[in-house]
Amino acid sequence: MAVRPLSASARVWSSSVSETGKSSQGQDQKHENYQNHQQSSLAGIVIKSALFATVVYGATMFIATKNDKVMDFVIDQQIPYYEETIDLIENGSYDDLVSAIKAKISSIRLPSKDEITELSHKIEHTSEDLLKETKRKLESARAEFGSHSTAGSGTSASLPANQLQKHPEIEHVKKEVEHLPAIKLNENVVSYVDASVKATIDSFNDLINSIDVSKVTPTDEGLIKTINEKVSELASKVGALSKKFDDELQSKLKVSQTELLSSYTKKELELTENLLHQFNRERAQLESKLNERLKQEIAATKETISQAAVNAVSMVRIEQTKNFEKLVADKINEERNGKLANLEKLNSRLESLEQFAESLESQVVATQQKSVIQKSLSSLKAVLFVSNPEEKPQSIKPYVDDLFESSPDDEVIQLALGELGPLLSKESTQSILTTSQLLTRWEQLVPELRSASLLPPNAGLLGHLASIVFSKFLVSVKGDKPDGKDIESVIGRVEASLVRDELDVAVEEVANLKGWTRKLANDWVIEGRKRLEAEYLVELIDAETRIL
């Protein structure tokens, strides 16, 4: 009788056991990595969320201090601690902010990191103990099942000769795996369970799903039931702790809210009092400014009204004056057309008479001015041309100034006086020589001219002595010789001209001399020309006054 080997079923069972062990080890490693990842990701999310919320809160409060719309939104939504934060931004400092945050944080009692870590480790250790206990019981059950299967096969299967003579038969078994019920939490506890606890429960459920129901003994089922109860109890404790933590947090928040409300009310009362005080002060200032401005406007209005009244009265007066003038003009026109019909003729005669009176007045004024000029000119002539050597010399300038003041705005007279003034400004009544005085000086100059005419060129002392001696033998010429070029002829013509009162001819003759004779007669020529210029200018003024 051939014995059917059980090696295939054994191999299937061993492979399932090995797969179960590998899967359990993989599940343990996966569960551990998942817990570490969950812890790190949860801490990172909490920190990032806190930082983001802090930045958004601070930016909103800062913008509210600059924008009225954002401030209205903050007040309407009653954002927590918005008054303290805005007051700190506007009036506070960094130290005040730190102290306020420390005070608020110290008033709230939260579980420490050590407590949370200890709770997480306790849950992890409990889960690991349960997992190890489950593995141990599964391995013992598998060992018992292997011993029972090998005992029935006996000695025939264990003999190597029989096993070599028999060909192994392979049995194809269709494996239908049933799973144990998963661990489920109570609905009242789910909302309070931490994420790490939920992850642990999910890991247990994965482990339970990997176990084949057909290979589980009643002992294993009891163990799984115990694990389920312990996990549910642990989740309930965690939920209770979370609920207790939330209750304590809510109580702390209520206390903080009450304190905040009281501080808010106190701050509101202080701000209201300050605003009322500031409002009263601003109102007093505005009232004083308004009263002062009203006084200024009233004064300006009074001045404007008075000026307008004065202008109106002036306009009325002007209008009445125009009406009166128009009435008088109309009345005069009526009288002119009636009783005063010959008034136009009388008016023309009066105009002609007025023109005659004006011309007569101008002639009288011109005659009077002419007489004044003639009088001043006569005084100047008397001083210039009629000089008494016995009288005391007088300056001629006052006479010239008197003539200048009395002269009209005539261009010729003004030019003549302009030349006469500088000429006679430094002269006196005795400095302008008359014709007789010039003749006397000429006679005194004649001997020197005669001796100078006999000097040779570059004459020395002997030449001067010889000229003096020989000049005594010269015969004087009397009369006028127009064609004579010698010195005696010139002397005769000059004397004849001075006797005839022809000073201009005599001066011209002397001015035409050459050499030493001209140099000796230079002073006489200057005096003669001064006399001639004065006579010419005075005669020019006299002639111009006659034709005025």
From Swiss-Prot:
Please, which domain of life does this record's source organism belong to?
Answer: Eukaryota
Among the GO biological process terms of this entry, one is: cristae formation
Where do the TM regions start and end? 43-63
Cystine residue pairs? none
Membrane topology field? Single-pass membrane protein
- Note whether Mitochondrion occurs among the keywords: yes
Q: Which InterPro entries match?
A: MIC60
- Mitochondrial intermembrane-side positions: 64-548
| Keyword Secreted attributed | no
GO CC entries: MICOS complex
* UniProt-annotated stretches for the region Disordered: 14-35
The principal location of this protein is mitochondrion
Protein name in the entry? MICOS complex subunit MIC60
